[in-house]
Regions:
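Extracellular beta-strand-rich solenoid/capping regions of secreted or surface-exposed proteins
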Residues: 117-119, 164-181, 189-205, 211-226, ...
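Bacterial N-terminal signal peptides that target proteins for export
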Residues: 1-9
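Sec/Tat signal peptide C-region and signal peptidase I cleavage site
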Residues: 18-22
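Bacterial N-terminal signal peptides
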Residues: 8-16
Length: 329
């Protein structure tokens, strides 16, 4: 199956500007990982408010916390309108539950081993049962993508739903040229990193994922790079690393890591960086800002972090200035 499963519901939202049809979009799961990546701790379903039928979600197993190497759960879907999320806890009773961030003000209803809550806008949530933050459920409710790139455009690299491995077997990476849009369709799983080296005007978009790459996305000696919507699951090194680059924008990125030196977003000698609406759960620094390191030289300046969740199981949510180029006598 290489298309998104799109559920157009009859529920209508009547607005002053007209009538908008509400939707839920779920992603197919490649057969090659369907059983290997599933977590049985929870059964999660969604539906539009006012509808009868529930839509099943696939519960991904994601590793968190370097000390305990715990198995947490992640689900994703796209939606518009207002939806209910139903969670069944499959291993024991629910004595207490909380939906974070607490600033969202979501008060779940509990009935036996079921939990129910409602959302009406895109969210990145942690649902925690009985005080357990290590075996919790992550709910990523994305906005529906309106402008999908044309897969026949010569400047588009389009990854359809399914498993994709790089032809560069030595580096296990996909190298991206200048003036290119890379689109990861929901359900696309890349088993390799994305390399932007000495390029400009690159976009990496979509609701697909990078699964256990050596590193996630590397941006070096480059300018004007946009990363929007992708999920990086358990890379062995950085989720996104920037070196001596300018004009990097990262939006709606989700990241999990559990190994040493598996930072979230690290920037060495980078400028004009915008980080907005990201979820980083890492076992090293979630965000690190450096000047000189390795072969990167120059200032690190004009970095903005907005509307984001930084969850450092190990190390720091933000680390600034550890490395540099000191004078020697």
């Amino acid at each position: 199956m290489n298309k998104l499963i799109r559920i157009a519901l009859t529920f209508l939202l009547v607005m002053t500007t007209g009538v908008i049809q509400a939707e839920i979009v779920i992603y197919p799961v490649p057969q090659g990982i369907y059983y290997a990546r599933h977590n049985d701790d929870y059964t999660v379903k969604v539906r539009q408010v006012g509808e009868k039928d529930w839509v099943d979600l696939y519960e991904y197993n994601v590793k968190v916390d370097m000390d305990t190497k715990s198995d947490a759960t992640m689900v994703q879907f796209d939606f518009s309108g207002k939806v209910e999320v139903l969670v069944q806890k499959n291993n024991g009773e629910i004595r207490s539950a909380v939906v974070r961030p607490l600033s969202k003000g979501i008060q779940p209803e509990i009935d036996g081993n079921f939990l129910l809550f409602t959302i009406d806008k895109p969210q990145k949530l942690s649902v925690e049962f009985n005080g357990d933050r290590l075996n919790n459920l992550h709910v990523f409710a994305n906005p529906i993508i309106k402008n999908v790139p044309d897969k026949n455009d010569p400047n588009v690299i389009y990854f359809e739903a399914g498993i994709h491995e790089p032809t560069d077997t030595a580096g296990k990476c996909f190298r991206i040229p200048s003036n290119t849009t890379v689109y990861l369709e929901g359900g696309a799983v890349l088993k390799g990193c994305l390399i932007c080296d000495s390029v400009e005007n690159v976009k990496i978009l979509g609701h697909g994922m990078l699964l256990e790459p050596q590193q996630g996305i590397s941006v070096t000696y480059s300018r004007n790079v946009l990363i929007d919507g992708v999920t990086v699951v358990n890379p062995r090194h950085y989720t996104v690393s920037g070196g001596q680059s300018t004009g990097i924008t990262i939006k709606n990125l989700k990241s999990f890591s559990y190994q040493g030196w598996s930072d979230g977003l690290d920037f060495m000698s980078c400028s004009d960086v915008m980080i907005d609406d990201v979820f980083l759960r890492n076992s090293d620094d979630c965000i690190a800002l450096y000047t000189h390191r390795w072969n990167y030289y120059g200032d690190c300046r004009n970095v903005h972090v907005l509307n984001s969740t930084l969850w450092a199981d190990i190390a720091h949510p933000i680390n600034i200035g550890t490395h540099g180029n000191t004078e020697t006598g």
